[in-house]
Amino acid sequence: FNCKKEGKSFEIWGSGKPLRQFIFSIDLAKLMIWTLRSYDEADPIILSVGEEDEVPISDVAYAVAKSLDANIGGTPLEVTFDTSKADGQFKKTANNQKLRKYLPDFKFTPFEEAMDITVKWFLENYETGGVRK
């Protein structure tokens, strides 16, 4: 957001190639409520999107830029990658197989849709004090 406001590029450390799993806060809230009400096992359960939904960090950066551009307008936000910085671990996959056993039909919000909703919320709440600066 600050890069967009100040006309600077959005710099990402590393190549952007590592994969990560992202869960929309509303989806996580629904799963946490389900866990509190219905999950009775002593063994933990992982509340995560599936491995097939892993997203490269570069896609995250481009999705943020795209959503900011769509909601603010102006000069498109340039995304750059500082490959002098380490990528870190390539994958940090959490297995949601157990969750799928209990909730096979749970629909996770698609990543780009969740990102757009999140950016819109951020922009609506930034100046009102709903977001820490």
What are these regions (language model features)?
Residues N2-K133:
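C-terminal substrate-binding subdomain of Rossmann-fold SDR/epimerase-dehydratase oxidoreductases
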